[in-house]
A protein has these predicted regions:
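Short, charge-dense linear interaction motifs
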Residues: 1-192
Length: 192
């Protein structure tokens, strides 16, 4: 038996990653700080609360010269990266937040705004309901097959849970071409 259900995600994540490279660490940190400030200004203008986003620590990677003859190692430059993870309470605003953050690409280079990814955090409650529906569907199909062959149904001898899948949603015209993680609605499917 098969059961399907269209479910709206209850959590959205938008990642903003910005980086720079410079021979002077202070200049690189200043550049990162400016990008962080611009991201936070947009989040404040959209009235997101501080508990709806998280600023990750700055990551600094020095790049060294590779001359084997020299006894001392020399730092050529620094790669500096930081990210902000946004998890809006109202996931309906995710597209609006994403579009507004995209404007930063006009001002800053080396900035990636990742499309919102949507998650169903309470998936277990849907699994149980789908298993019940799929089992009922299997029983109904078995009865129909037996009627065609003029047989009667006996007791249930065995049942195996098959696949549980999260499939892309084809009903949301705005996101129909997006990958499943980037769709707010998902199609859950259970087979028994």
């Amino acid at each position: 038996g098969v059961a399907e259900k269209r479910v709206k995600a209850d959590k959205a994540i938008i990642n903003v990653v910005f980086s720079t490279s410079n021979t002077k660490l202070e200049d690189a940190q200043t550049n990162i700080s400016e990008k962080e400030k611009a991201v936070l200004e947009i989040l404040k203008s959209l009235e997101l609360k501080e508990n709806e986003y998280h600023i990750n620590n700055v990551k600094i990677q020095p790049n060294f010269s590779e001359r084997q003859q020299e006894r001392e190692t020399k730092i050529l430059n620094y790669d500096v990266m930081q990210s902000v993870v946004i998890a809006p309470k109202n996931i309906e605003r995710s597209d609006e937040i994403y579009e507004k953050l995209q404007e930063l690409k006009l001002t800053f280079n080396n900035m990636e705004i990742v499309k919102p990814e949507y998650y169903i955090t309470s998936i277990e409650k849907y699994k149980k309901d789908l298993l019940v529906s799929a089992t009922e569907n299997a029983e109904m199909r078995a009865r129909e097959m037996l009627k065609v062959n003029k047989n009667e149904i006996g007791g249930l001898e065995n049942m195996t849970q098959g696949q549980f899948e999260i499939l892309p949603d084809k009903e949301d015209s705005k996101h129909v071409n997006d990958e499943e993680p980037n769709q707010m609605y998902k199609k859950l499917r259970s087979v028994v």
